[in-house]
């Protein structure tokens, strides 16, 4: 795989973007999925620009983490969010898939915290935004290895509800993929990605996913 400088220069026609809060494991997931050598920051929010990896006409994009960024002022955080939205709007036609990566154990509490302030959590806002601009979106519910097996189903139900999806979560297996990137357990996500590629008649990309 080659790191892409700009999609325009590379003749890209098919893009998959990965979005999520800082430190939810996006870069680790990309490495596990594609073997991509994407820089992984030790502190939340180290990545401030999109990181691209290209193979054939497929572009894989790791968008900057939104939300808390260590050592980054609030104003700059807003700029990163605005640039992310602008990037998605500008390239919506070629962005065929969006993967929203979340920290599963923390997600319900994060959403509830923002709800208590009468504010829309940025994760939920991003999920809704991607779908509004017509981008098929998958939820990569990461860090499930930190969840007790007995609480697995109830947590995924809570995640679905907070995303505006009625429980039980099993009704949304075509959208929600429980994974653990660090443990290499990403089978559910790979399955959903391949399902989407097949629907788009891009089985030729299976060898990269």
UniProtKB/Swiss-Prot annotation:
Domain of life: Archaea
Keyword GTP-binding appears in the UniProt entry: yes
Residues engaged in binding Mg(2+): 27, 47
GO biological process, one term: cell division
Leader sequence residues: none
Coiled-coil regions listed: none
Cofactor requirements of the protein: Mg(2+)
Residue ranges of domain EngB-type G in the record: 12-203
MF terms (GO), sorted A to Z: GTP binding; metal ion binding
List of residues binding GTP: 20-27, 45-49, 62-65, 142-145, 179-181
Pfam families from the UniProt entry: MMR_HSR1
Keyword vocabulary terms for this entry: Cell cycle, Cell division, GTP-binding, Magnesium, Metal-binding, Nucleotide-binding, Septation
InterPro entries in alphabetical order: G_ENGB_dom (IPR030393), GTP-bd (IPR006073), GTP-bd_ribosome_bio_YsxC (IPR019987), P-loop_NTPase (IPR027417)
Function: Necessary for normal cell division and for the maintenance of normal septation.
Sequence similarity: Belongs to the TRAFAC class TrmE-Era-EngA-EngB-Septin-like GTPase superfamily. EngB GTPase family.
Protein known as: Probable GTP-binding protein EngB
Source organism of the structure: Methanosarcina barkeri (strain Fusaro / DSM 804)
Native organism taxonomy: Archaea, Methanobacteriati, Methanobacteriota, Stenosarchaea group, Methanomicrobia
């Amino acid at each position: 795989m080659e790191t892409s400088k700009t999609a325009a220069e590379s003749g890209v026609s098919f893009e998959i973007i990965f979005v999520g809060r800082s430190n939810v494991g996006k870069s680790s997931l990309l490495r596990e999925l594609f073997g991509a050598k994407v820089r992984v920051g030790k502190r939340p929010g180290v990545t401030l620009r999109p990181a691209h990896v290209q193979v054939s006409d497929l572009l894989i994009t790791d968008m900057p983490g939104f939300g808390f960024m260590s050592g980054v002022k609030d104003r700059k955080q807003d700029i990163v969010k605005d640039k992310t939205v602008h990037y998605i709007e500008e390239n919506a036609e070629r962005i065929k898939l969006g993967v929203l990566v979340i920290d599963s154990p923390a997600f319900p509490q994060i959403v509830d915290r923002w709800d208590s302030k009468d504010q829309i959590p940025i994760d939920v806002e991003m999920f809704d935004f991607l779908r509004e601009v017509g981008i098929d979106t998958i939820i990569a519910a990461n860090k499930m290895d930190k969840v007790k097996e007995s609480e697995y189903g109830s947590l995924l139900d809570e995640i679905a509800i907070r995303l505006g999806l009625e429980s039980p979560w099993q009704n949304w297996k075509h959208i929600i993929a429980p994974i653990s990137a660090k443990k290499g357990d990403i089978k559910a996500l790979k399955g959903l990605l391949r399902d989407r590629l097949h629907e788009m008649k891009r089985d030729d990309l299976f060898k990269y996913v």
